[in-house]
């Protein structure tokens, strides 16, 4: 198959998967199990192993799936990471936000950009990874409730620690206007102690 045909196939498969993903109404705080089942099914058919972690109510789910390297080595794995939840729908939509609509070569639907589009691309490429002579593991990490407080990711991270799954190169497919971003804002809290004499100058 030519490179051009491969690209066409990848594009069409990405659009098909994205169309399916948009159809899952995974608003933050709501059940995302059906979407996780869909993703897990695609990956397991390709030979991936997976496990899940949950919120306290067992209705919101993280998925962590792995396509193993063909040979044993110490190369760091690649982690393709994305969140499955979307923000609630506001007014102003001219089409059903949970039905993918293509207009003027653009695809519209809640979460199409942030960030079901990346998840669709990762899943569309998975068959290529599964047939390749991988020299490192490829992980797929799909989490819940990023939009509200990044609730799902810490639960998954604790399970990764418990299973002693080593860190690696993590690609988080958030929309960035096609720019590579190698850092993100965050916060850290410090408690400090000082010794000395109080003073003031003006």
Q: What do the predicted segments below correspond to?
A:
Residues 201-202:
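A short acidic/glycine-rich loop-to-helix N-cap element
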């Amino acid at each position: 198959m030519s490179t051009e045909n491969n690209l066409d196939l990848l594009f069409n498969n990405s659009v098909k998967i994205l169309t399916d993903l948009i159809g899952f109404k995974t608003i933050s705080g709501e059940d995302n199990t059906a979407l996780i089942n869909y993703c897990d099914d695609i990956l397991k058919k390709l030979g991936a192993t997976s496990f899940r972690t949950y919120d306290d109510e067992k209705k919101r789910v993280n998925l962590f799936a792995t396509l193993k390297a063909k040979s044993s080595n110490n190369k760091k794995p690649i982690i393709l990471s994305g969140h499955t939840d979307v923000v609630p729908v506001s007014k102003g939509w001219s089409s059903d936000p949970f039905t993918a609509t293509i207009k003027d070569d653009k695809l519209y639907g809640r979460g199409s950009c942030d960030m079901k589009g990346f998840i669709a691309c990762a899943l569309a490429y998975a068959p290529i990874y599964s047939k390749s002579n991988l020299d490192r593991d490829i992980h797929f990490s799909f989490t819940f409730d990023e939009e509200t407080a990044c609730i799902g990711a810490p639960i998954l991270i604790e399970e990764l620690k418990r299973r002693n799954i080593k860190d690696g190169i993590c690609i988080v497919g958030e929309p960035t206007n096609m720019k590579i971003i190698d850092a993100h804002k965050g916060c850290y809290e410090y408690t400090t102690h000082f010794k000395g004499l109080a003073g003031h100058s003006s």
